[in-house]
């Protein structure tokens, strides 16, 4: 007999069975908590790749068609705000007006996680480099960037942002002062 707690006495057979049951329950809990790839990630990844191509085509209406009506988008400029859809459109219009031959070359695409739970949520992260030419100066640029895009159930972007040195990039390709 094994006395595990005051008042509870178990036979070796009962104790072994309880140990096995506890281990099986622990394994079940572990498996149920394991994160499985979000089934929407592959769809969202394809949408993300299309979106980057569309942005490079400088078709602003098509670029914005990938966004839901209610979005939050983070600007890459120093002190840049969290923007709604209208502000995001102006942000992209500024890039399209200032640059030409815009191209994004991804180094990788990664599944994103919910910041509150740490669980995969179908969002897409990417590291890569943007290149192009500043329209007003004719100077070329290339810079490393990080982007994140979160999607709703309809495949529309509801949250996203850019991380890169946007201010430095603009300063490096501005027209020379005379």
Where would I find each of the regions flagged by the language model?
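Short, low-complexity N-terminal intrinsically disordered segments enriched in polar/charged residues
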Residues: 33-61, 65
């Amino acid at each position: 007999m094994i006395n595990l707690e005051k008042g509870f006495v178990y036979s070796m057979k009962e104790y072994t069975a309880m140990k096995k049951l506890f281990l099986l329950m622990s394994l079940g809990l572990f498996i149920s908590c394991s994160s499985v790839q979000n089934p929407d990630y592959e769809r969202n990844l394809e949408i993300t790749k299309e979106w980057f191509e569309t942005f490079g085509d400088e078709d602003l209406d098509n670029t914005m068609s990938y966004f839901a009506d209610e979005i939050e988008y983070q600007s890459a400029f120093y002190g840049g705000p969290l923007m709604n859809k209208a502000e995001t459109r102006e942000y992209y219009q500024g890039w399209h007006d200032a640059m030409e031959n815009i191209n994004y070359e991804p180094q990788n695409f990664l599944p994103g996680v919910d910041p509150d739970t740490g669980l995969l949520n179908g969002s897409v992260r990417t590291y890569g480099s943007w290149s192009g030419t500043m329209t007003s100066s004719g100077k070329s640029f290339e810079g490393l960037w990080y982007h994140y895009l979160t999607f709703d159930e309809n495949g529309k972007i509801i949250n996203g942002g850019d991380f890169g040195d946007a201010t430095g990039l603009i300063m490096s390709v501005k027209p020379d002062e005379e």
